[in-house]
Design a protein with these regions (language model features):
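Acidic, PIN/NYN-like endoribonuclease modules and their adjacent C-terminal/linker elements
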Residues: 1, 94, 99-135
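Acidic active-site catalytic centers that drive phospho-/nucleotidyl reactions
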Residues: 9, 90, 109
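Short helix-capping/linker segments at secondary-structure and domain boundaries
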Residues: 19-23, 49-53, 99-106
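Active-site neighborhoods of divalent-metal-dependent phosphate/nucleic-acid chemistry enzymes
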Residues: 65-106
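PIN/NYN-family metal-dependent endoribonuclease catalytic core
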Residues: 7-8, 26-54, 61-62, 66-70
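Metal-dependent nucleic-acid phosphoesterase active-site entry motif
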Residues: 1-22
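Alpha-helix/helix-capping structural signal
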Residues: 11-12, 72, 110-111
Length: 135
C-alpha cells in the first residue's frame, strides 16, 4: 500500500524558507515531523512545481516531489473560478488536491478552512482591524 501524499502549499514553502516570516517557526516544526514521517515511509511530500520554483531554497525541499500543472488542471480550475469567483491559483491547488487525492495540506492560507481539507497544523488568520495588536 502506498503511503498518503501530503501537499505543501506555497504559504508553507515561503514560511519555511524565510526566517523572517511570522509562520517560520511553526513551519519548521511541522516540516521536521513531516520529514520524519517521510523517512519512515508514512507519507509522501508533494508541492506544485511552480510554487517550488518560486522559493529560492531547492536543497531545503529535496524530499518534495513536484506536481506539474497541466492544461487539464488549468481548464478545470478556470471552470471553478467562473462558478465560484475564487482566485485562479487557489482553484488550481484545489483541483490538484482532488485529482491526486491528497490527504492533507500544510499551509497557512486561511482560505483552506472553507473547504473539506485536512490541514496540517493550525491555519492562521490575519488580525482583525478591531482586535488589539500586541507589541
Amino acid at each position: 500500500m502506498d503511503p498518503p501524499s501530503y501537499l505543501l502549499d506555497r504559504t508553507f514553502l515561503v514560511a519555511l524558507a524565510d526566517v523572517d516570516d511570522p509562520n517560520h517557526d511553526e513551519a519548521k516544526e511541522s516540516y521536521r515531523r513531516l520529514i520524519d514521517d517521510f523517512v519512515a515511509q508514512r507519507c509522501l511530500l508533494v508541492a506544485r512545481a511552480d510554487h517550488l520554483a518560486s522559493v529560492d531554497a531547492p536543497q531545503l525541499f529535496a524530499a518534495v516531489d513536484k506536481l506539474h500543472v497541466a492544461r487539464q488542471h488549468r481548464n478545470a480550475a478556470k471552470k471553478m473560478v467562473r462558478a465560484s469567483g475564487i482566485d485562479l491559483d487557489l482553484a488550481i491547488t484545489l483541483v490538484l488536491i482532488r485529482r491526486y487525492k491528497l490527504r492533507k495540506v500544510a499551509g497557512f492560507d486561511e482560505r483552506f478552512a472553507g473547504y473539506d481539507i485536512t490541514l496540517i497544523g493550525p491555519v492562521t488568520s490575519p488580525v482583525d482591524d478591531n482586535e488589539p495588536v500586541e507589541n
